[in-house]
Amino acid sequence: MAFAEISSRSKNLLHLCVIGPECTGKSTLSVMLANHYSTNWVPEYARAYLDKLNRPYEQTDLLKIAHGQIRLEEEWMRDARRLVVFDTNLLVLKIWSEHKYGTCDPEIIRHHESRRYDHYFLTDIDIPWEDDPQREHPKLREHFGKVYNELVRSSGIPYTLLSGTPHQRLEKAITIVDDLLNQRSATNH
């Protein structure tokens, strides 16, 4: 399956990715950030896909989820203003696939490496766990926290670890995003 290159308009957007283990406030923060900046947030496609699946997911489903996530990203970036917030990215599929199946489809890795992100917001595990039919590993949050931390740190993409209440996380993220927007504005003049 071929995907179109990101449009030239979306290349001017600040790409922010909220990422972290299960049940760490990623979606909440993504929505709050997008609302604060009156822009779009790209929801996690896996959630909608799995909601419609009438069986346990299999490794082959992960590539379908990756394709759906990319389509969703392209769609939501079209109308974004100044920045776009991604509620996770393909890195989550790599982590889950390697954990559950011991390997990850090379196409998922290629697509992940071809995507551009300007900043990661890594959500900490200090938010209480809430049960959800799609959440699998409440006892492995610390393990996955370390996995995400290592992969984000080694990506070379600037990142900020966000801890505390949802409001504290939002305040810290806004400070970072405002700085990034100001830097971008200064270089474009």
Question: Which stretches of residues belong to each language-model region?
Answer:
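Conserved lysine of the Walker
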Residues: K26
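The conserved Walker
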Residues: E22
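Extreme N-terminal, non-catalytic leader segments
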Residues: M1-L14
